[in-house]
């Protein structure tokens, strides 16, 4: 068992006084209680598979996502990826999916586990949005901007990293770093990579984005008719209950 606490010495001492009785209650948990608990839980079963799937609804809007891994990319600049995430979210994806496409929102993300995703919500489109995702790597390869624009993107990225944190947020970040084996040195390295990012670093991340799309599977929640029109994209289509 791992217990995380955020607080001062007084809170820590209070936890120490209570943890013993808490563990005793766990030890006293009877089989009958276990069965009663399981009765109200849906038990996951079956083999997990990578499939592109859609869930149909009567709504006229879609939620369009594609997610994949980029294990095959040898060298990854995690700081540059954070800059690219900001750039895609507030430039390419914003303009193509939100402004031109009419979606309420859109975004992408990449993590240290070499996973990435693109997603839109309240989106009137389906295949057009997927096509935008597929051309994101091309956008990065051809990216060109004045130094001032690159600096603005870096500032926007670093502001999300260096934002003031509440005690709750500090505790959450600390626990997440502990569970994922992220050290202070790793976080500082990523911060330095963000600050030192240039146009060439941005262009080189195209390999990561291209691999996410190549490896990716699609998941869509949306209009039944639109999904039926694009049924070849999916290995599974089910009504959303």
Predicted feature locations:
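Nucleic-acid-interacting cores, centered on viral/eukaryotic replication and modification enzymes
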Residues: 11-13, 150, 196, 210-215, ...
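His/Glu-based metal-binding/catalytic segments typifying zinc-dependent metallopeptidases
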Residues: 4, 9, 16-20, 24-98, ...
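Glycine-rich, charged/polar anion/phosphate-binding loops
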Residues: 48-53, 104-105, 203
């Amino acid at each position: 068992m791992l217990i995380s606490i955020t607080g001062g010495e007084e809170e820590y001492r209070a936890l120490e006084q209570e943890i013993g009785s808490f563990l005793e209650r766990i030890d006293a948990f009877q089989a009958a209680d276990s069965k009663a608990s399981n009765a109200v839980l849906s038990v996951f079963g079956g083999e997990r598979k990578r499939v592109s799937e859609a869930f149909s609804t009567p709504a006229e809007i879609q939620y369009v996502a594609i997610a994949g891994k980029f294990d095959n990319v040898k060298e990854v600049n995690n700081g540059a990826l954070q800059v690219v995430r900001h750039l895609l979210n507030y430039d390419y994806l914003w303009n193509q999916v939100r402004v031109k496409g009419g979606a309420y929102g859109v975004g992408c993300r990449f993590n240290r586990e070499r996973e990435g995703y693109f997603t839109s919500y309240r989106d009137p489109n389906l295949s057009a949005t997927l096509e935008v995702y597929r051309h994101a790597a091309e956008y990065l390869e051809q990216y060109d901007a004045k130094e001032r624009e690159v600096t603005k993107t870096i500032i926007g990225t670093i502001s999300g990293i260096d934002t003031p944190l509440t005690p709750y947020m500090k505790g959450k970040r600390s626990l997440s770093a502990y569970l994922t084996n992220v050290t202070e040195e790793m976080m500082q390295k990523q911060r330095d990579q963000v600050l030192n990012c240039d146009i060439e670093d941005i262009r080189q991340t195209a390999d990561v984005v291209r691999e996410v799309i190549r490896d990716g599977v699609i998941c869509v929640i949306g209009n039944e008719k639109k999904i039926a029109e694009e049924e070849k994209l999916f290995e599974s289509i089910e009504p959303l209950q």
